[in-house]
């Protein structure tokens, strides 16, 4: 084999080895990113929830004041994921808290929301997304002048959906002591008051 052909062959061999190595890395990475236990969704078909509707069709209001619509139930995902929408929100929000075992994602659909995650402050406007990792204290409040809408996703679902349903059974906001007890019963800890909103 002459030098020119050897260089071409060596270059081709190096490229093949690199691609093979990358494929192996990609395969290992995908495997590492897969959930530890994937049992599949509980439902075996698509779940469609129209705008303005709740997954299970009933009207829900947290503490009798915050409209809520379940979009994806933990029952749909075998507990892997839960998503809900706060629509037509007025000013205010929950107390500062943390989740022991769940990450939370917020997506602003309408209006303006103030957030604090750890020591960082954010303002979410339509189209903005914010991720709050488990074990990091966070608080948020709707601060807009017109009604707002916020989509929230919880991963894994855990008992958060049950917390939401129990909160919807209450007709008025809980006292700070009642909120602490309720949050604690569902894997969360209240660590401060709600954000002040003018």
Regions inferred by a protein language model and the residue ranges of each:
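Ligand-binding loop in jelly-roll beta-barrel domains
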Residues: 134-160
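N-terminal export signals
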Residues: 2-28
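Short acidic-glycine-tyrosine-enriched beta hairpin
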Residues: 120-134
């Amino acid at each position: 084999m002459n030098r020119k052909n050897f260089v071409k062959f060596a270059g081709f061999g190096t490229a093949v080895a690199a691609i093979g190595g990358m494929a192996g890395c990609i395969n290992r990475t995908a495997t590492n990113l897969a959930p530890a236990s994937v049992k599949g969704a509980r439902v075996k078909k698509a779940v469609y929830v129209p705008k303005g509707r709740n997954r299970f069709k009933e009207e829900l209001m947290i503490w009798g004041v915050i409209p809520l619509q379940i979009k994806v139930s933990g029952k749909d995902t075998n507990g892997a994921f839960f998503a809900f929408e706060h629509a037509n929100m007025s000013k205010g929000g929950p107390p500062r808290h943390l989740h022991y075992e769940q990450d939370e994602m917020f997506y602003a659909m309408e209006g303006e929301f103030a957030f604090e995650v750890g020591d960082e402050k954010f303002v979410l406007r339509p189209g903005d997304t914010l991720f709050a990792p488990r074990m990091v204290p966070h608080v948020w409040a709707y601060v807009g002048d017109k009604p707002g809408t916020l989509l929230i996703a919880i991963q894994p679902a855990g008992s958060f959906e049950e917390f939401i349903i129990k909160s919807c059974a209450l007709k008025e906001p809980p006292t700070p002591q009642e909120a602490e007890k309720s949050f604690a019963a569902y894997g969360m800890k209240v660590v401060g008051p709600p954000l002040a909103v003018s």
